[in-house]
Amino acid sequence: MTNDPRATLSRAAKSGYVATMRGIAWGLNKTSVADWLSRRHHRGRGYHWASSLMAIHDIDGLIALDVPWWTYDAIEVVDAFLKTRPARVFEYGAGASTIWAARRSASVTSVEHDADWYARVLERVQGQTNICPVDLRLAPASNAKDVALSDPIYLSQKQDMRGLNFTSYASEIDKADGSYDLIIIDGRARQACLRHAANRLSPGGMIVFDNSKRARYREAISESGLSVKRCPGLTPSLPYPDETSILTAHT
């Protein structure tokens, strides 16, 4: 595994930002400002986003704010979609979005590659009431040298996971019969996950593809043959705009 100085610097900057925002959140909790924002975050996107900035990489904070980690425009589209049907949901990449979806759907299956994060999410799911059945699965990556590869699309392109194979993870959606109304792609090996997801999408269903402005993801989305609605803009807990895309079958 190579050590890219740019990736190292990026991770350090992100860690520094997270630590700073958590320090600010701790300080605000000692004042009336945090309570003031908390009472107003339901009044509009601006208040909600300001409140969420203190919940960066904080699953409990995002659960309390009742948001997934997508752009607000995408959240609105998916929320409206879930109100139209008792949706069967599959998710790549568990987190606050798992509970958000479980509050609005008939069933949620979520696959996670990281054992520690899986345990944290499972604890939160088990502590919830008024959610649908959630099937949380662990599918860790394999070392690429130990797996016969038919397609490099299953190899992680993330710097700190280079050389790991996510075939089992991406294929988890194929272990159950039937199709899914909503498929969320917000984890590892997203191009491979999209390939599997496109074959399991219900008629009239949608795929949520997060962080879709990244070049390698744009290419995979373009080649998927699906209709694309790009939703750029503010994202809960992020200080900069991002993009989430909604993919649907052509009608």
Predicted segment positions?
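SAM cofactor-binding core of SAM-dependent methyltransferases
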Residues: 72-146
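Short, charged/polar micro-motifs that form catalytic or ligand-binding hotspots
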Residues: 68, 87, 91, 183-187
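C-terminal substrate-binding/active-site "lid" region of AdoMet-derived donor-dependent transferases
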Residues: 173-177, 182, 187-251
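A generic local structural motif
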Residues: 75-78, 95-97, 167-173, 192-196, ...
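Class I SAM-dependent methyltransferase Rossmann-like catalytic core
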Residues: 45-85, 154-162, 167
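Membrane-proximal basic amphipathic "stem/tether" segments
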Residues: 1-66
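S-adenosyl-L-methionine
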Residues: 122-177
